[in-house]
A protein has these predicted regions:
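C-terminal motif of bacterial Sec signal peptides marking the signal peptidase cleavage site
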Residues: 16-19
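Structural recognition of the beta-strand scaffold that forms the well-ordered cores
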Residues: 34-38, 69-74, 138-141, 207-211, ...
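Terminal, contiguous helix-loop blocks that mediate binding/assembly
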Residues: 26-28, 165-408
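Catalytic-core segments of thiol-dependent peptidases
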Residues: 75-82, 88-102, 113-204, 213-214, ...
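Hydrophobic helical h-region of N-terminal Sec-dependent signal peptides
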Residues: 10-14
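N-terminal extension/subdomain marker
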Residues: 21-134, 395
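Short acidic, gly/pro-rich beta-turn/loop elements at beta-sheet edges
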Residues: 45-47, 80-82, 149, 221, ...
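Bacterial N-terminal signal peptides that target proteins for export
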Residues: 1-9, 235
Length: 408
């Protein structure tokens, strides 16, 4: 893949120039911490992602001389056009010697017409590893997303037998962000990075992974990614297009010896909870990936004991994470499902202990649009529907299902 890259002579000149002016030379060697931002915005989110990047640059940023670095992979539309090529680029974001933020282009991927693919993401992350070898990596991906559900699948597919929606007038809600997609020519033709491809695209283990994507807070996604990261920050509902919190992102990830992921989740929750009307809509979950196996064991015990109670009618009574007019109606609260399956007191105690360890923090606004959020544990799960043969077959390929056998 052809790329325009800065040549080493320029880097050498920068070092010499810094030395001649009494400035600290740029850091070389193995970095302590590298934060990677991936903004897949060649879609209707392009303007929002540009604003997020500007907010990130307003934060406390490391300087070139420090052993910490912020790297941003960005792919946006050109003036909102889905037909005009605009090559993605890799930037280094840092605080210059004058105190102002700098976005320095490291690489432009001229031949990468589609960034929403396993191959493209792997290329970029391999480049980051090569340019910035580090003891610790953290990553945030921002784009559309549908959790574990295939990107092109909606509730109307397969003509499944589901509970009819209550008759209600259509309401115009604020736009949300639906792991990663790109519009090819028009918004009706989107290419997605499916969950398992996303997992395959990450070449190194990261300390934390923040997904600024809709509906990422499902146990199926978390379990699929558990061996790639120590912690996940995800949302079981959709996310408004303003996205995660970016004006304090870098300081909370890099301002001390350890990333303060709980404080970041609290900042996200407070940002949305302080709004009013339909904009007061947000959920956030912090997952300790090392505790997911214990959660699977506790949930599997409930499922094995009460499988006969696993009926499609539960989709009408279990706490949902999708609002009534959504066309993605596959996300239900894991704990509430266990309770409605008829779990015993002992089984619920074991599940609650596993959830407390696995989900050290979660928070929800009182509602998301017109969906009341009343019985939430922070993780969603699928309730199988017999009429969805294709979706159920897809579910069988997930690591979570291999562990708990929800779909048989």
């Amino acid at each position: 893949m052809l790329r325009r890259t800065k040549i080493s002579l320029i880097a050498l000149a920068v070092v010499l120039f810094a030395g001649c002016n009494g400035m600290d030379p740029p850091f070389t060697g193995t970095f302590e911490h590298v934060f990677i931002y991936c903004g897949l915005g060649y879609n209707n989110l392009s303007g929002n992602l540009k604003a997020n990047l500007e907010d990130m640059q307003s934060d406390l940023l490391p300087g070139l001389w420090q052993d910490k670095a912020v790297v941003a992979f960005c792919h946006n539309t050109l003036n909102g056009s889905y037909t005009t090529p605009n090559p993605p680029c890799l930037l280094r974001i840092y605080r210059g010697s004058d105190g102002k933020p700098v976005a320095d282009t490291l690489t432009t991927y001229d031949n990468m017409s589609v960034s929403a693919s396993k191959e493209a993401l792997r290329t970029v992350l391999d480049d980051v590893r090569g340019m910035f070898p580090a003891k610790h990596y953290g990553m945030l991906l921002s784009s559309h997303g549908t959790g574990w559900v295939p990107g092109r699948y909606t509730s109307s597919d397969e003509n499944a037998v589901t509970l009819a929606r209550a008759s209600r007038p259509m309401v115009s809600w604020p736009e949300t962000k639906a792991v990663g997609n790109q519009y090819i020519g028009s918004s009706k033709n989107a290419q997605w990075i499916e969950l398992q491809d996303f997992a395959d695209a990450i070449p190194m283990k990261v300390d934390y992974l923040i997904l600024d994507n809709c509906l990422s807070g499902c146990v199926e996604l978390a379990y699929e990614l558990k061996d790639l990261c120590d912690y996940l920050v995800i949302s079981p509902t959709e996310i408004l297009t303003s996205g995660m919190v970016y004006d304090r992102l870098v300081r909370l990830m890099m301002g001390s010896n350890q990333p303060d992921l709980k404080a970041y989740c609290e900042a996200y929750y407070n940002f949305y909870n302080e709004k009013s009307g339909s904009l007061r809509s947000g959920t956030i979950t912090l997952v300790d990936c090392a505790k997911l196996d214990a959660l699977a064991e506790a949930f599997s015990a409930v499922l094995d004991a009460h499988r006969d109670a696993l009926q499609p009618g539960l989709t009408g009574t279990v706490q949902r994470y999708y609002y009534p007019s959504s066309n993605l109606r596959f996300y239900y609260d894991l704990r509430d499902l266990a309770a409605q399956l008829g779990a015993t007191g002992a089984e619920m105690s074991a599940l609650d202990a596993a959830l407390a360890a696995c989900v050290p923090y979660h928070a929800e606004t009182p509602s998301f649009f017109d969906l009341q959020l009343e019985r939430c544990c922070g993780l969603s799960i699928y309730i199988p529907e017999p009429g969805r043969k294709q979706l159920n077959n897809q579910y069988k390929t997930l690591s979570w299902n291999n562990r708990v056998r929800l779909v048989q």
